[in-house]
Amino acid sequence: MSLKNSLNDSQHKFHRRMIVGFLNTLYKNLPKKELPESINSIIIIAQEKLGDAILLLPFLKALNDRFPGIAIDLCCTSYNRKIFEGISFIRNCVSYRPYNLRFSKLIRSEQYDVLYNPKSGPSSTFHHITNKVNANVKVCLNDSYNNPIYNVHLPNDNKKHIAENYCELLNNYGLSSPIENWLPKYFYEFPSTINDGEYVALNMSAGHQSR
């Protein structure tokens, strides 16, 4: 990364933290809670970048295996919907960007056991969504800017692979490590892409050199 790009990235992160810090003064700060013994319904906010979104897939499979019949609603960007909308065990796959009426109606009408934000750092968009969603327990990865509007703050190790960090929620429900790689079957149906069951996933947006 060039010095100019590094400075721009630092400025962007500082700006984002300032916005989220300000939102924390406006939004209701939540008390700490315990995770429920079982999860019957959950809403998950998927990250914006394509690589980060794909790396969420093993977590989704493990979540559905751990809680058969769980109602999973997933929020993502419009350009990432194709990754998730064909997964049979996802009840609703809706885009939060651009903001739209279907998404607004969903987050205002549903009551979830758990809201899960697996993003390791602050996001003003995710903060706004979290504040609007009705959930008994709101869960994030530990971050001083995120924590005020969440009930549960999971370990957030920036030296772990992102896919492993995503699964911190399931570590509280007996998930054994390492997690199992998984892609939906339709990934193998794309022409001239993945032709067999063995694959390598590269995350080009890793935020730490150890990843």
Feature locations, PLM:
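Catalytic machinery of carbohydrate-active enzymes
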Residues: 1-211
